[in-house]
């Protein structure tokens, strides 16, 4: 499996993980003020997940651009 294919598979997993993180944050916001103490933890997890996904997408673009050259 090439680096590009491996990264695409990773992005697919990260995308699913990011949707789950987004829903966790959404669910938490709907239940406020219950569990307000977990806002920072859930928000940080969501941020980290989306940051990792964005970084992987940038790397994929770079790899694809390099492969096309």
From Swiss-Prot:
Record has rRNA-binding as a keyword: no
InterPro entries: Helix_hairpin_bin_sf, Put_N_fixation
The keyword Manganese is annotated on this UniProt entry: no
Alphabetically ordered keywords of this record: Nitrogen fixation
Gene Ontology biological process terms from the UniProt entry: nitrogen fixation
Organism domain of life: Bacteria
Protein family membership: Belongs to the UPF0437 family.
Protein's UniProt name: UPF0437 protein AZC_3451
């Amino acid at each position: 499996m090439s680096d590009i294919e491996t990264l695409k598979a990773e992005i697919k997993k990260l995308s699913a993980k990011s949707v789950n993180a987004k829903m966790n944050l959404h669910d938490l916001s709907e239940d406020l003020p219950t569990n307000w103490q977990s806002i920072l933890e859930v928000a940080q997890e969501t941020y980290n997940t989306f940051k990792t996904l964005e970084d992987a997408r940038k790397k994929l673009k770079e790899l694809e651009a390099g492969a096309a050259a």
